Amino acid sequence: MVASSFQHHLEPMLTQPIPCQICTYQSHGVNFNVMTCRACAAFFRRSLVCGMRYHCKTRKNDCRIDSTERHFCRLCRFQKCLQMGMKAEKIQQNRDPISSTFPGTSTEPELSEIVDPENEKSYIFHGTLYGFKSLLAEVRYIFSISRNYSDSPLTDLENGFKLITRHQKRRYIDIEDRINFQNLTDFRLGHIKNCATWLTHSSFFQSLTETENLLILKSTWHVWSWLELLSVSVEIFGNQVCEEKIVFLSEKIAVDIVKVFRYILKPLNKQEKRKVEKELNPIFHILFDDVARKLQNLKPSSLEINYMLWQLVWFVAEKVLNEDNLRHGEQYTNQLASDLHNHYKNDLHLEQYAQRVLKMMAIVKSLQKHLMNIHKIIDYADNFCNLFAMK
């Protein structure tokens, strides 16, 4: 059922791209009753939620709104949203999740969806500008790094995991209840680059085309990051993760995620706060009461964590690869399973390990099932940070 649902979301990627009815970049689904890209959907939501009042930058009220323009006039963009039929009541009905489908195979402008920019070129957090081309260049550099691979693919992935976590503190960590907007930007970009670095430790991933690499990264980094963060958090904080919603975000910082979002939502009125909390609470339940608790009970080894991380990646990759790459990917994934078997037999001296594997796959399936919902946490954080920056 999950695979069938995912295939349904994936189908638009295999057909001719449909342009956004507002800006003409590639759309990502129906948002507020109109086929739009993620950026235009986010812009429309912010405009309504904040009651924004715009002025035409040319004072003619007829500015061009399409992919030929680098910076859109906000008034004319909003007017075009209304003219195309975007409905304000859709915010009340379903609190549009910004994107209901997975993005397709990218050209460079679409790749900016990795950082969810408002104008597909750059985005602003509290006055800080970060262009997607800078991030894209960094990711491409990471993908270009040559790795030495061993006869054990799972050990290679573990080495990648050790590399990205090598500077993480294990003691004397501050637990914050609010996040500086610049830090939030840095955290997010750091997780994207960490995921990219880890992926390069897969010999199979490195054999794919750049387009396939970028598509896989773009579609998996957010859920991959949550499993990575929760596994490290449970290792450091134990039961505090489940009971107090404490999550490790970077090398030195952990946060009380509930208090952080309460702080982020503070400028909203009570009604809008309740709406956002109503949507976020089930997602926090999945991450902390389900996934984190299962991790706490399982206490996975480092190799087991890396096996689960790959399963999340393969869940996406097997839907988008051609027949030859799919066959090679299946062989690679089978080799990981063989390495895991050897880990149980030779390292842990377990003769019966089926129950551990079932528990691991239960964690993976929980994250797979709620893949798009988990992405909403990132969308909400970004949207409200952009909202404050505009103010």
From Swiss-Prot:
Coiled coil: none annotated. GO terms for molecular function: DNA-binding transcription factor activity; RNA polymerase II cis-regulatory region sequence-specific DNA binding; zinc ion binding. Its main location: nucleus. It is found in: Nucleus. Keywords: DNA-binding, Metal-binding, Nucleus, Receptor, Transcription, Transcription regulation, Zinc, Zinc-finger. GO terms for cellular component: nucleus. A zinc finger (NR C4-type) spans 20-40, 56-76. Residues 17-93 bind DNA. InterPro entries: C.elegans_Orphan_NR (IPR051152), HNF4-like_DBD (IPR049636), NHR-like_dom_sf (IPR035500), Nucl_hrmn_rcpt_lig-bd (IPR000536), Znf_hrmn_rcpt (IPR001628), Znf_NHR/GATA (IPR013088). Residues 146-391 form the NR LBD domain. PANTHER family: NUCLEAR HORMONE RECEPTOR FAMILY, NUCLEAR HORMONE RECEPTOR FAMILY MEMBER NHR-127-RELATED. Belongs to the nuclear hormone receptor family. Orphan nuclear receptor. This is Nuclear hormone receptor family member nhr-218. It comes from Caenorhabditis elegans. The gene is nhr-218.
